[in-house]
Amino acid sequence: LRRQKRDWVIPPIKVPENERGPFPKNLVQIKSNRDREAKIFYSITGQGADAPPEGIFTIEKETGWMKVTQPLDREHINKYHLYSHAVSENGKPVEEPMEIIVTVTDQNDNKPQFTQEVFRGSVPEGALPGTSVMRVNATDADDDVETYNGVIAYSILSQEPREPHPHMFTVNRATGTLSVIASGLDRERVREYTLTMQAADLDGQGLTTTALAVIEITDVNDNAPEFDPKTYEAAVPENEAELEVARLATTDLDEPHTPAWRAVYSIVRGNEGGAFTITTDPASNEGVLRTAKGLDYEAKRQFVLHVAVVNEAPFAIKLPTATATVMVSVEDVNEAPVFDPPLRLAQVPEDVPLGQPLASYTAQDPDRAQQQRIKYVMGSDPAGWLAVHPENGLITAREQLDRESPFTKNSTYMAVLLAVDDGLPPATGTGTLLLTLLDVNDHGPEPEPRDIVICNRSPVPQVLTITDRDLPPNTGPFRAELSHGSGDSWAVEVGNGGDTVALWLTEPLEQNLYSVYLRLFDRQGKDQVTVIRAQVCDCQGRVESCAQKPRVDTGVPIVLAVLGAVLALLLVLLLLLLLVRRRKVVKEPLLLPEDDTRDNIFYYGEEGGGEEDQDYDLSQLHRGLDARPEVIRNDVAPPLMAAPQYRPRPANPDEIGNFIDENLKAADTDPTAPPYDSLLVFDYEGGGSEATSLSSLNSSASDQDQDYDYLNEWGNRFKKLAELYGGGEDEE
């Protein structure tokens, strides 16, 4: 193969953007040396020809003139890559495709553009000249490599406010970096500067644009906080910890709620004992002075505190530290008596006699100048065992002590004593007494469990555990024996360890429930008899099952009998209560005893030999006034008048007397009341009256010995009876 020499002739192509035409406009003529040998046809392909954007470039097929059909925009496409082709009349290529690069040359048709409309930055107040503040930035779409069309220069057009100097800042014309050029930045004077920035292409000589640069002057701690006021006075009661004493206010010209403004307080003098603390209120920035512990009026009555204040941030310059003076007066209050020691330990035997002194526990009153009297009382005595003398604090045994009581823990009984002074108001101090009870041998050994099940033939011994609530040496080793005749059928033996006992049958017994009396002895000979409930089963060896004999369940009848007895007792108590309440009401008698004949029955004419019914119950004649029968008399027309209203019988027994008086008065004034052809009972005393029956009255043929003058004194209701028997003559 032999390399073929390239015969294309393609000069470089540069096309200015934004040309005015006319279009199409010739750019360059493409020629092949083969055109002398044969007729050549030319064509182009690529971007701008047959690829988007299509139709920008064309070529004359026979002459090879390449043309542009419209204005170009370098900012849109700055270079076009195309390929030229040469073919013969029969369509065969006569040249290799050749690359064509069309370069669009720039024109200054775009002005610079800032990347932001407003740039924001900050610089601390007091910054020295040369301190960098911020950077502004602008871009230009034009070419900044081959031309100056895209080369931007920055400048400051104006500054607001124009103090303390009209040119406080400068800008690097090439980079856009802003920096301080003059001293005197003071946030308390000017908090913010606004600069008008300009960007110009052609290195400052071309198109321009503007933007704003806002520079905030940040605060530094160049102002010391000051107390306002500088002197404080306060009073606090003694013995009050964490009590607010005073609030100290400060002023600071620095930016609020910044480290340069937030205050830090300290007590620099007068707080040698650490009685006070001071903190900063984060909301108000005030210094809050509090008591760290309770003050003692008797020890010190006044404090003079010196308080200093600084900021969280250190001072940017050398500044003096402000101080304030706080005078705190301590107010005297009635302090509670103080037990010494606050926890008293004592040891006593648990069997001390009642009234025996156990310990003396006293308190001292801190208010010595007041010479108050102290009274001692028990504050907490869970078991109620102790008593304390109100004047000298001597503690004695009120009840029998018991080391084994559930109120003790590890043989120690805790009680709380109170010491109350006679101040206004009284103050109470507390002291704790820990009373260690020394063990005595007051409990005998006990077996567990107390219910066993055993076979009556070849039984397996039942092993019981021995417990003793006392402490050594008042415990084991233990001894055991049977009592109350239990040894006739049972045997017992203490185990090798000394804390168990074995119980078994020595002769067969019928299946039943038995009581075995087991006596256990401790080392000191203290004994106790315990009843073991032994269920003997009809079996051999170890109990597998024990069928119980049927028995009559008497639980329900017993419960019913108990309920009946309780109800009967309640009924008796209720009757006794009613009787007592009746007797408490004392009423005047309705009639004098000598005039009261209601308990006597007189005979007013006998026409036969006596009553036919000798056992008539007089109670059947009794009816209340509210249930009396209607009586109709045929021989006399009843008067047309309203019947009286009778009061209903009250439920309260205490009002029975008033009930009788009111209804008797209503009956006496009732013109419709008897005597008619009816029978009334004026008083009935029950079955216990002297005249149990009307048959007890002897019949008489004459009533000459009777005096009926007293009937005139009985009122309107007996007027008719008095007329009948008052002045008539006896019939023969």
Swiss-Prot record:
Cross-referenced InterPro entries, in alphabetical order? Answer: Cadherin, Cadherin-like_dom, Cadherin-like_sf, Cadherin_CS, Cadherin_Y-type_LIR, Catenin-bd_sf
Sequence ranges on the Cytoplasmic membrane side: 581-732
Q: Which residues form the propeptide?
A: 1-6
Side Extracellular, residues: 6-554
Q: Any stretches that span the bilayer, and where are they?
A: 555-580
What does the record give as the function of this protein? Cadherins are calcium-dependent cell adhesion proteins. They preferentially interact with themselves in a homophilic manner in connecting cells; cadherins may thus contribute to the sorting of heterogeneous cell types. B-cadherin may have important functions in neurogenesis, in at least some epithelia, and in embryogenesis.
- Protein name listed in UniProt: B-cadherin
User: What species was this sequence derived from?
Assistant: Gallus gallus (Chicken)
